[in-house]
Design a protein with these regions (language model features):
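Juxta-kinase regulatory segment immediately upstream of eukaryotic protein kinase catalytic domains
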Residues: 14, 18-20
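ATP-binding pocket architecture of kinase catalytic cores
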Residues: 21-142, 146, 153-156
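Active-site activation/catalytic loop segments of kinase-like enzymes and analogous catalytic loops
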Residues: 175-213, 229-243
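ATP/Mg2+ or Mg2+-diphosphate-binding catalytic cores
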Residues: 233-280
Length: 280
């Protein structure tokens, strides 16, 4: 049951009383803490929630409906957002979510987000820099588009969720992070370990590039941004371990250890020319 006060709530807000909370599966940082209450989702707010909400409202106002509409921040420290109905695949990902059709639809959705975000000024807002583009930029990016952060209907991506890593950057970097997670960019061992079936990964990167609408220069930029994306996630993981974050250490131990980042880097370096040739 939920009552209380919503901070930053517009006149359309409705506080539901007597509606049971339904826990939603998924997530790493907030695992077990995300619930559905009727038409809304409640999840722990973060230091950047106000900025994220402003961004989500702006892209919705621009006509892009593929993100949840923020409702407000509860006085119990949870943010409330619109619930978007559909299927959210969790690892090990089901076959339908690993198809080229699913990948292309995720990529087109990201392109739609980027187009809608161009009118939003990130200045004056605060952002999570953990996965942010090291080169910086002026376009707010998602930075963590993986299948479990996407809502699907009938195998087609219809919405992006979980924007806690959103930050300004380059569109190519955001697309590279999507590719790292959705192609995926992993060696054979880790691809199988996390439940991805064997696939032609260079060909899948081309599927993403085609779906986004990249020209020749854009494909070169994507290849270069892949290096930044691979380096950034490794640096974030090592930083969490160095600071002794128990949740990060437990997650890392459960998902292959710090060695998986070395394996990914070696695999990407060994296959870089193959990816470049396929993208042409």
């Amino acid at each position: 049951m939920l009552g209380g006060t919503l901070i930053g709530c517009d006149q359309s807000c409705v506080i539901l009383v007597g509606v049971a909370e339904e826990r939603l599966d998924g997530g790493i940082t907030n695992a077990g803490k995300i619930v559905r209450v009727g038409p809304h989702v409640l999840r722990p707010a973060c230091a950047h929630s106000d900025s994220i909400h402003a961004f989500l409202r702006a892209v919705r106002h621009a006509g892009f409906e593929g993100v949840p509409l923020p409702v407000g921040i509860h006085d119990d420290g949870r943010e409330r957002l619109e619930f978007i109905d559909g299927d959210v695949p969790l690892a090990p990902y089901p076959d339908w979510s690993q198809s080229d059709t699913a990948l292309a639809s995720i990529t087109r959705l990201l392109r739609g987000l980027h187009d809608a975000a161009r009118g939003f000024d990130p200045e004056g807002h605060t952002w999570n820099d953990a996965l942010a583009d090291p080169a910086g930029g002026t376009l707010v990016c998602h930075n963590d588009v993986e299948p479990s952060n996407v809502v699907f209907r009938d195998g087609i991506a219809v919405a992006l969720i979980d924007f806690e890593f959103a930050a300004p950057g380059r569109p190519a970097y955001d697309l590279a992070q999507l590719a790292r997670l959705c192609v995926p960019i992993e060696d054979d061992f880790d691809q199988a370990r996390i439940g991805w079936r064997a696939a032609d990964r260079p060909a899948r990167l081309r599927v993403a590039a085609d779906a986004y609408g990249l020209d020749r220069d854009g494909r070169t930029e994507l290849l270069n941004a892949m290096d930044d994306a691979i380096d950034r996630i490794e640096a974030a993981a090592r930083r969490s371990v160095d600071t002794g974050d128990p949740n990060a250490i437990a997650t890392l131990t459960r998902t292959g250890g710090i060695e998986k980042y070395d394996r990914r880097r070696r695999w990407w370096t060994d296959h870089h020319d193959e990816f470049a040739a396929t993208l042409r």
